[in-house]
Amino acid sequence: MNNSMSGKKKSGSILSHAVLILFALSALLPLSLVLLNSFKDQKSIVRNPLSWPETWHFSNYAEAWEAANFGRGFINSILLTGTTILIVLFAASLAGYVLAGNRIKGTKFVTVYFMVAMTVPIQLFLFPLYFVMAKLGLLGNVFAVGVILGAVNLPLAIFLMKSFFMNIPRELEESARIDGATTRQLITGIMIPLVRPGLLTVSIIVGIAAWNEFLVTSTFLQGQNSFTATLGFLSLNNTYNTNQGLMMAASVIMIAPLIIFFLIVQKYFIDGLVSGAVKG
Amino acid sequence: MQMRKATNYLLIAPSLLLSLLIVLIPGLLTLLVAFTDWDGVAVSPSFIGMQNFQEIFEDRIFWKSLFNNAQWTIMFITVPVVIGLLTAILLLRRKRSRSAYQLIFLFPYVLAPATNAMLWLNIIFNPVSGVVGYLKNSLGMSITSPLSSVHTALYAVASVDIWHYWGFLTVVYLAALRQTPGDQIEAAQLEGCNSWQLFKFVYFPSIKPTFSIMLVMIIIFSFLTFDYVYLLTGGGPAHSTEMLSTYAYTFAFSAFQVGKAASVALFMSIMGLLASCLYIWLSKNDLKG
């Protein structure tokens, strides 16, 4: 009896491991194929994309870096993402503080507004915005696009910051008030240091979203000089269809920094995903 | 005291102003433009009433897009949800390997749609240099790129998007499952519940609020889906993967019929708004806070 129970448990455990490994492989195999083929030339990729490289073409990387203009692209990506993060941190932390404490008359209204704003399609405001930006000569301006992505990511950031502020005990604020702290002192001296993990979480979630964004970025950034790394990478696709080794090397240049960054900040990233979605 | 109240309005102002200028006002402009024949250039477009809506409702491709969005929704509320739940439940008991699995599952989710789409396009689906090409040319199997057939393109695009998305659900579901009160689990085990009963009567009720919110979010975003479709097929072949979003985008930037694009965008927004109401209703507990 006991034996068969543990036998059953064991086979269940093996099965569950097998399922998890299968799904892990489904995530990893396509990425490994990219890495593997980034060292091969077109001929050997066409012969067999699943084979180990016979000769290692490290030059694919240098060629890809040149062809996609990644030097320029990464600088633009950093400027754009940095703009988005700074704007979102400033606006969302202040708004989160106000909404968490129910400090204004229209708290409910503002909350509903940002909930709707979070789920509205980008196409709802994209077209008029595009033609206004064109009029203002702001197409191709990475900072302007950074601001737009700031507005797009703002609602989620506000709700994240709000939940971080709500975890601060009310008494802390009250005692600071009794000691005569102004709102400014209260926020910069007490609140902001306490929600620092929240600021980090918001920066990471919003930063990755802005870095990866496609619809807004590709619509507004025209002209090679304003291309982000992503757009530079995409511009390869038509020209280098017959040089897949170069395409794969460019993909690795796109993928590797992001995966490394993700592994470094994993705790904050997962915290952000979860607190944005899990309802208690 | 009075000053302090005024300060609070000042603090919310940057967020409201930013959203007003970039989301709300252009959004209202879309509402206006939807009833005009604006081409994006003209200074004074003429008001044409419901004509844009009449024309899109008569367009076969509009209905095709709507139907594709509906199919997309059905695929997304089933496949990734089932995979996410299954893997989350399996990870619940793997205390040591849990975080490693979570990280691996999130890899595709963290990467840009542009990178993921190009990856599948070039090394998997490509009929010359991809795995598909290898199976066809070297092993002699009779397959073509699933993206090039009107019968399979939608499923192929959805597969790539689902491949990138399901890990997110695993992480969210797992976090919710872990909040299930321990005493409830113990009580159920003492009562002799088997694994399925434990899930059905203890774990699932506990994660239900999260589960419903995620379902609503999936429905909303299924009606807005753009990136993978646009990058992998651009809506083709023969509109077989056309979505409302790509349909609107083509009107605005290929045909310069901005009025029409706006009317499609408005239609999408109304669909989204209905789902948003559901979302707000489900998170009404947050509003009390």
What role is predicted for each listed range?
Chain A
Residues 1-4:
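Short, intrinsically disordered terminal tails adjacent to the first/last structured region
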